[in-house]
Amino acid sequence: MHINASAIEKVVLFGDSLMAGYGLPKEHHLSSVLENNLKQAGFNIQVINGSVSGSTSSGGLNRAEWSLSDPGIDLIILGMGANDMLRGIQPDETKKNLEQIIKIAKVKKIQIILAGMIAPTTHGAKYKKDFDAIYPKLSKKHNLQFIPFLLEGVALNPSLNQQDGIHPNQQGTIKISENIQKSITVSYTHLRAHETAYY
């Protein structure tokens, strides 16, 4: 799919409290940290916080059309499913909702980086197996740039999480930003290649 852009200029973080900056001042929200880090690396990219604390994949789907309505959006980081998992929502339902969000973004010619989640064994081994498989299956089916686990290097590390043990603190947010930035750089290069080939 051709993307008519010379570079990524606007990124939307489309997720839940794990990307929304829950419990942190605005300057330490993931959107702020990621935008600053990208600028320091030479990328003039605006990062929009389109995440909503408490959002399930169903809630994300309900707001996807208007949240992604800005024609200037080049890329979304899709990171939802944690609240589905906490509520025991069936993985098939989560997968269906995420796939619909992916399709909405594709129709709008928005690039997608899919950030995966990993379930604990709270709801049983079968639930964990089915849930964990959602993200690699969707990334393969739709040929998406893929971050296997959004909280890689952060989850279960007390020094990188707030007192609730769930939401990243300032240092944890920096780590997540680094993980996402690597994938954005790949997507940036991909868009540049598309533009060069087109012209």
Task: Please report, for each region that a protein language model flagged, where it lies by residue.
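Serine-esterase "nucleophile elbow" of acetyl-processing enzymes
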Residues: 3-53, 63-72
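Structural recognition of the beta-strand scaffold that forms the well-ordered cores
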Residues: 12-13, 47-49, 75-79, 113-116, ...
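Solvent-exposed loop/turn segments at secondary-structure junctions
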Residues: 18-20, 52-57, 82-87, 118-122, ...
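Catalytic-core regions of hydrolytic enzymes
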Residues: 51-73, 85-102
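Short, amphipathic alpha-helical "lid/cap" segments that border enzyme active or binding sites
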Residues: 61, 95, 170-181
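Active-site segments of SGNH/GDSL-like serine hydrolases
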Residues: 79, 99-133, 152
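Extracellular serine-dependent O-acyl
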Residues: 113-118, 129-159, 174-188
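Conserved small/polar residues in nucleotide/adenosyl-binding loops
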Residues: 189-196
